Amino acid sequence: MQVTLSHDRAAVRVSPERWVVAGLAIALLAPVVAVAGVALGLRLDVSVLVAVVLGMAVVPSLARRLPREWDELRRTHAAWCAAWLVVAVLAALRSAGVAWFMADPQHAQSSAFWFDPFYVGHSCYSAYWQAAELARSGVENLYDTSHYAGFAGRFKIDEFFYLPQFLLLPAVGTALGGDFLSLRAAWFVLETALVGGAMVALCRWVGGAVGRRAALLLPAVWLASPVLVTLQLGNFQLAAIAMSVLAMVSFERGRPLLGGALLGFAVFKLFPGLLGIYLIATRQWRAVGWTLAFSALYTVAVYAWLGAAPFEAFVHYQAPRILSGEAWSFLWLDGLEPVVAINDSVPGLALKLDALGVGGMTPAIEKAVSWVWTLAVFALAIFAARRAAKMSRLELVSTWLALLALAAYRSPFVPDHNGLFAPIWLWLLVAAGTRLQPSRVVALAIAYLALSAVLPFGGMPLPELHGRMALSTFSQAIAIGLCLWVVLRRPLGEASGARASAMPSPAMSMG
């Protein structure tokens, strides 16, 4: 009886490691909850108090649910635990700062790039909000650039480039009421929850020691600028990637309805459509059917609600501008070389070479490169699909992320904060499945720094144009190289996960 009671007490005991992980996880989550309260109309101080109370109530339950394999890590891998603690605290602090700026834009000093006037005054969400307002008011051509010349508070209104169907999400927000700032906060909460939830869901689906290691690496990815800067800006790129990956996991789990609902909307960002090629090549006809069905449903819903004007404006005005390159022609103007320098687009390499004085670089060359790259990523999707049956879960999700990143690089303009998100997430998966030897630790550290390199425009000493080009292109090369390696490497299958779990390495032990 005594032995049984002692065993039961040991079974329910929560280790210090799990308490710390749970506490820091809630520290990352609580500021987002506080922003949600502000979006709903609560005062910031009240919202923060509610978030703190809720967080403290959740910590014990979360700590009990965390993997017991993490117990005693502070004794067996003290240095790794100390490094993890520093990164996790920094991630929580930086995330809290961004959340404060999202709740109250007057506190620019807490934003991700507080020193850069451009990032402090830029909001990608402003384009979605303005376009939704224009569509609901019945404007004939919501894509007319003259509609986006003003400001929303301190934020310069961005130009809207998306398909009309995308308006469904921001239009729901504007229909529910609230001003731009409250809807900006709500959009941040929605996208943060979606991205964070997708990251955790992938770790759980991969499972095993690799999944646990991936979960421990999440604070490092969350700390990276491609995540927090882009969440602050409100660009849909992150949500589109998260929705696409969740859709593919749903298809693998035999839930085509959910997967179709997610991917059917994500494809309105265009580049996730590459996964449709992958699904066709793997003969997942139910997944293809549900994706097409939901895309059609969203299209009908937007047409019925907002009318024909947005669609007609896109077909007759915006689509020709995109196809001809006119929509991005400003990138060829003199004086925009700093913008060209942060462009991670593959066709945008022509712009970089032109800015460096290389002759023969023209919009025609840029367009030719874009179509060659399009054919290349189509071929890579089919190549990956033909080997999908041999892949482990880790290899599958890594391949999906790599394909999404490569497809996104087809656009004429991919700012570094957008273009590096999928690769930094991919880095997490590669690191989680890698045996940690000194040379590999160095390589992973260099890759992490390169994939975190979002270059500011001002507010601090910056390298000259050639230096910016070199830094940006190095980061771009690491990102593209990582994605290509993941797609082209030979699949090891489920045995790879078992092999990684059996490796006598720090990474294995910390899993």
Which functions belong to the PLM regions below?
Residues 3, 15-258, 282-416, 500, ...:
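Primarily membrane-embedded glycan-assembly and transfer machineries that use lipid-linked glycans
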Residues 10:
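Active-/binding-site microenvironments in catalytic and ligand-binding cores
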Residues 15, 35-41, 426-507, 511:
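Aromatic-enriched
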Residues 58, 62, 266-272, 425:
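Hydrophobic transmembrane alpha-helices
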Residues 259-260, 309-316, 418-422, 439-445, ...:
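A cytosolic-side transmembrane-helix exit/cap motif
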Residues 260-263, 271-282, 289-293, 420-422:
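Transmembrane-embedded, aromatic-rich helix segments that form part
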Residues 395-399, 414-422, 432, 436-443:
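Short amphipathic alpha-helix initiation/capping segments at coil-to-helix junctions
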Residues 410, 423-425:
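Active-site proximal loops enriched in glycine and acidic residues that flank catalytic Cys/His/Asp
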